Design a protein with these regions (language model features):
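N-terminal secretory signal peptides that target proteins for export/translocation
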Residues: 1-6
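Bacterial N-terminal signal peptides
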Residues: 8-20
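Flexible, solvent-exposed loop/hinge segments and secondary-structure transition points
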Residues: 23-163
């Protein structure tokens, strides 16, 4: 083959690699306001049934607040704390309480310096298959494991809608 033939073949190959298919929009699922509200209200109702006054926050896939509810009689810090828990669970794709162990194993990861970060237990990521579409966090129960149990009950309630 001549040099011109190689150049033409290279240009043709380059044109094939840059096709409109690589410029398509992303297809993704996001939490609806209705599902987010259901998760927050169910988490609060579950905790309330156990005698805990809590606040709940549900964040979307980008960490933005979708729903935040302060429970009757809860201290003001529970709003911020429920957000930090949810934001941490969304950002790192794990239950918020697992961050403490991660930091012990890798203190140089720097997560502790992020705004909105916490190691407190009480939030879970909301998954659609392997995709994290958000997270829910609760604060106010006497112990993060109780907060987390309320979140789990709420996510379990809407699990059939997360497909």
């Amino acid at each position: 083959m001549s040099v011109v033939s190689y150049r033409c073949a290279a240009i043709g190959l380059a044109c094939l690699l840059v096709t409109p298919a690589s410029a398509q929009l992303l297809a993704r699922k996001d939490l609806s306001a209705a599902i987010a509200a259901d998760i927050a209200q169910t988490a609060m109702a579950t905790c309330s049934a156990n005698g805990y006054r809590v606040s709940a926050t549900v964040v979307g896939r980008n960490g933005e607040v979708l729903v935040q509810i302060r429970g009757d009689g809860t201290p003001p810090h529970t709003m911020e704390n429920s957000f930090k828990k949810a934001f941490t669970a969304r950002t790192f794709r794990i239950p918020s309480g697992e961050m403490e162990e991660r930091l012990k194993k890798n203190p140089q990861m720097g997560a502790q310096y992020l705004t909105g970060f916490t190691t407190a237990r009480g939030a879970l990521p909301i998954m659609v298959g392997e995709d994290v579409v958000g997270a829910a966090g609760v604060s106010g129960a006497p112990g993060g494991e109780k907060d987390e149990a309320c979140v789990k009950a709420a996510i379990d309630k809407v699990a059939d809608q997360l497909k």
